């Protein structure tokens, strides 16, 4: 299909993406209508899908999607959790109407219910899991595009894109490539420049891991928004010093001089009173002496005692 046009030819980088996401690996069982897309079979029974035919079907499906004038008339569905994020991203970039999760029976056929829709084109992730919308689409003549594995039933499927629709990365890659080709056909993006949207955005993410990452980002944002203490001129600043364990060894202590007058000279309040050296004599009262107008009596000189109560006889007998 795209062999004669170099612009639509399969690029080496796209083949690398197919192989990295294991989009070429099918199931062990092969439906009789999917045999034309099987390239070979491995010794363990796994079928190998021809990626060139996968690419051609991606281009065909993109042309069918781009032919719809109103993008909201395109309904993309995924009941499997692995394809719900990819469906929402595809609808975000192309303007389609997503139905992620459980499909309410009667959405396409029951005109009484609130969620009634009349789409012009239906794109599903797995025709086996999404059998209810595929069956209802056959009742109201809605064409169906589906990502099909080697064991997927092709009943009521108009355009089958052979790929591994059981792998997380393969499902995200196929929706990413389909969205990129639709935007290229519409002229929104150029074929000369790579699409700035990463394929990782279409991959399924565990809700618990996503919640942990959101909490970590919120904590980091709150930490950055916290007011920081600003230093002002009135604020005192103390430089950090070394810790001293023994303060007595660091502080010099001056020696205390011993006064010649004894304790009384150091503790008396009247410094005109001379120091008292004879502790047997009564202390003079400076207050009475000052009242009488007489000078204070001089302290008596200490007498030396020569006799200690014994005789000087030399006879000890």
UniProtKB/Swiss-Prot annotation:
Keywords: Cytoplasm, Ribonucleoprotein, Ribosomal protein. Pfam families: 40S_SA_C (PF16122), Ribosomal_S2 (PF00318). One of its GO terms (biological process) is ribosomal small subunit assembly. Residues 277-317 are annotated as: Disordered. CDD domains: RPS2 (cd01425). GO terms for cellular component: cytosolic small ribosomal subunit. Its main location: cytoplasm. It is found in: Cytoplasm. Residues 281-302 have a biased composition (Low complexity). PROSITE patterns: RIBOSOMAL_S2_1, RIBOSOMAL_S2_2. SUPFAM superfamilies: Ribosomal protein S2 (SSF52313). One of its GO terms (molecular function) is structural constituent of ribosome. Component of the small ribosomal subunit. Mature ribosomes consist of a small (40S) and a large (60S) subunit. The 40S subunit contains about 33 different proteins and 1 molecule of RNA (18S). The 60S subunit contains about 49 different proteins and 3 molecules of RNA (28S, 5.8S and 5S). Interacts with ribosomal protein S21. NCBIfam families: uS2_euk_arch. Required for the assembly and/or stability of the 40S ribosomal subunit. Required for the processing of the 20S rRNA-precursor to mature 18S rRNA in a late step of the maturation of 40S ribosomal subunits. Belongs to the universal ribosomal protein uS2 family. HAMAP family: Ribosomal_S2_euk. This is Small ribosomal subunit protein uS2. The lineage of its organism: Eukaryota, Metazoa, Spiralia, Lophotrochozoa, Annelida.
């Amino acid at each position: 299909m795209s062999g004669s046009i170099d612009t639509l030819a399969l690029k080496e980088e796209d083949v690398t993406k197919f192989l990295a996401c294991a989009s070429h690996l099918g199931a062990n069982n092969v439906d009789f209508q999917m045999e034309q897309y099987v390239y070979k079979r491995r010794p363990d029974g796994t079928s190998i899908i021809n990626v060139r035919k996968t690419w051609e079907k991606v281009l065909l499906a993109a042309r069918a999607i781009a032919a719809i004038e109103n993008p909201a008339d395109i309904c993309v569905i995924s009941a499997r959790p692995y394809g719900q994020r990819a469906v929402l991203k595809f609808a975000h970039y192309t303007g389609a109407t997503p139905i992620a999760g459980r499909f309410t029976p009667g959405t396409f056929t029951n005109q009484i219910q609130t969620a009634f829709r009349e789409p012009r084109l239906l794109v599903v992730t797995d025709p086996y899991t999404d059998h209810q919308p595929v069956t209802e689409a056959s009742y109201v003549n809605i064409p169906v595009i589906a990502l099909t594995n080697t064991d997927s039933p092709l009943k009521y499927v108009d355009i089958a894109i052979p790929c591994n629709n059981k792998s997380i990365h393969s499902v995200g890659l196929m929706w990413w490539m389909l969205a990129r080709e639709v935007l290229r056909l519409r002229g929104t993006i150029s074929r000369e420049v790579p699409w700035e949207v990463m394929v990782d955005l279409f991959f399924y993410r565990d809700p618990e891991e996503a919640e942990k990452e959101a909490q970590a980002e919120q904590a980091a944002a709150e930490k950055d928004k916290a007011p920081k203490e600003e230093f002002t001129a009135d604020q005192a600043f103390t430089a950090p010093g070394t810790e001293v364990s023994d303060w007595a060894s660091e502080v010099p202590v001056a020696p205390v001089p011993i006064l010649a007058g004894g304790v009384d000279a150091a503790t008396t309040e009247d410094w005109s009173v001379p120091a008292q050296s004879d502790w047997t004599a009564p202390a003079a009262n400076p207050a009475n002496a000052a009242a009488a107008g007489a000078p204070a009596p001089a302290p008596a000189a200490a007498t030396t005692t020569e006799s200690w109560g014994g005789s000087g006889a030399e006879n000890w007998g």
